[in-house]
Amino acid sequence: MTMPFGYASPEQQVRDKSEYARKGIARGRSVVVLTYVDGILFVAENPSTTLHKISEMYDRIGFAAVGKYNEFENLRTAGIRIMDTRGYMYDRRDVTSRALANAYAQTLGAIFTESIKPYEVEIVVAEVGHTAADDQIFRLTYDGSIADERGFIAIGGQSEQVLTSLREHHTEGQPLATALRVAVDALTAGAPPGAQNGERTLTAGNLEVAMLDRKRSRRLFKRIVGSQLDGLLEETAPSAS
């Protein structure tokens, strides 16, 4: 049977869409999400002070993303509406990261299957529990695939190098400053060389940092900026040789 000109099998279409999405995501700077003694820490390489990769979603839930900003921003705002509606109609305790992750998985899966162009995004939805054992971190990819991660995850460009560093240095129950240093060192390991082909140095001005702190009252999400971020970085800065 002769195939019409320009025909591509379903398998080829899936491969092409996947390659397209992965290339777009790989161009984005990485984001790390990891647990620390009092909650969950979000760290992104992001020099912009207005275009956030990390956001608060609900009482105990945070969001991080890489890829095309307008696409993951659309998902973020839609997620907030979903959770606000669910909390209003039922109970705030019914709003969970798992429910949000499932909604995102359905949306991304439908877009990947039905649209010519998939979303070029990778997302993390995290929820801080009342204890460390209750913390939840979900990773979602462009095709709607969802994974339940434990301890840490990295998304975006060079994520494999970043994950290798996290596996070596992250441990459960680390203090906030130590977890931040682990995240920054991991992002540095995944960053391309600097102008002189040397190791890049990530400073507070290159970072977007936030946390979900289970010890806080009411709003558990807090951005770490300014002198607080500088102090945490200085606390674990490598000694000059």
Curated annotation (Swiss-Prot):
Keywords: Cytoplasm, Proteasome. InterPro entries: Ntn_hydrolases_N, Proteasome_alpha, Proteasome_alpha-type, Proteasome_asu_bac, Proteasome_sua/b. The keyword NAD does not apply. GO terms for cellular component: cytoplasm; proteasome core complex, alpha-subunit complex. Pathway: Protein degradation; proteasomal Pup-dependent pathway. GO terms for biological process: modification-dependent protein catabolic process; proteasomal protein catabolic process. The formation of the proteasomal ATPase ARC-20S proteasome complex, likely via the docking of the C-termini of ARC into the intersubunit pockets in the alpha-rings, may trigger opening of the gate for substrate entry. Interconversion between the open-gate and close-gate conformations leads to a dynamic regulation of the 20S proteasome proteolysis activity. Its main location: cytoplasm. CDD domains: proteasome_protease_HslV. It is found in: Cytoplasm. Component of the proteasome core, a large protease complex with broad specificity involved in protein degradation. The 20S proteasome core is composed of 14 alpha and 14 beta subunits that assemble into four stacked heptameric rings, resulting in a barrel-shaped structure. The two inner rings, each composed of seven catalytic beta subunits, are sandwiched by two outer rings, each composed of seven alpha subunits. The catalytic chamber with the active sites is on the inside of the barrel. Has a gated structure, the ends of the cylinder being occluded by the N-termini of the alpha-subunits. Is capped by the proteasome-associated ATPase, ARC. Belongs to the peptidase T1A family. This is Proteasome subunit alpha. It comes from Parafrankia sp. (strain EAN1pec). The gene is prcA.
